[in-house]
Amino acid sequence: MENTKQKELQTTATFNAPLVLIWEAWSDPEKVVNWWGPTGFSTTIHEMDFREGGEWNLTLHGPTGTNYPNRSIYKEIIPLKKIVFEHFNPHFIATILFESKEGGTEIQWNMFFDSPEQFDIIVTAHKADEGQKQNIERLQNYIQQLLDEGKFQD
């Protein structure tokens, strides 16, 4: 059995919000654009064909003005349970699992890299772990904003 821990970045987060709202935040481009990317970044979504085989193309705009194009293909979507996408350049597979918990929702977000060397480059050199943590924080803040503004009804 292969040890994936040297090639995997895993984050778990709990939200005080219903699963359907968290799912919408991941599946609706009008919501994704409000939280995707590390702190200080903005996002332009060029295409988000949220279906298995669909493309997700976006540009992250860094705080210094640098643009970072991103391309992914959705590999598996199980409504309200699971999203898997393949990201290119750098290559990794992302799996996001959604689960209702008492009083909220838990997500588990895994990124699987091709090799320990690629993991080291992306996670250690480019701080992907910190970026993923900031993405979660931005999502937490966005969800809270939607709830506070009454923009989501169960």
What kind of region is each of these model predictions?
Residues 10-16, 49, 59, 73, ...:
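Generic structural detector for well-ordered beta-strands
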Residues 6-12, 19, 43, 55, ...:
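Intrinsic-disorder/low-complexity, polar/charged segments enriched in Ser/Thr/Lys/Arg/Asp/Glu/Gln
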Residues 19-20, 50-51, 75-80, 97-106:
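A short, structured loop/turn motif at beta-sheet edges
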